[in-house]
């Protein structure tokens, strides 16, 4: 009789449905893998406010939560929104629940992470809508708009093309992007204990995805 696998649990707050769909897809992919040493449980809420998410959690002991958030643009409104999110993650440490918030940001958006599963996406974009062409190329699709791509049925059609190997490819491509940013002399911004680049592409969502795969013996 096969040995029963232990379950690793991960906590998230995300800003949109696509991020949640992705995390549940990854959970199911790992849990169906014979190679995985552990099962995965994902506690993920669509919640733009990290502080509200933390306050509503019923937990005991030290807990790590990852907030997946988009940089959106360098417009002052979006930059302020981004920094307000960081402030809330910092404040979540002070509510007496022993919560540590980690930041899985994407610049511009989570769609960059989806593209990296299939192809490189190293060039800077002037607008989020410019992800549509590489998305269509990566997934051999003909989505008419970003909203069309994010329709639940269409987004899952992209996920269904992916494997653990594609996730590992995305991690490696993301690491190369961040290394290139450093080599290009971009300034790593520091704000309330969190780091990020103003320049796109840049992203840190790969850190928690890599950790999940490592914890399950898949990397």
Tell me the role of every PLM-derived stretch:
Residues 13, 67-70:
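Conserved beta-strand segments of the P-loop GTPase G domain that flank and frequently precede/overlap
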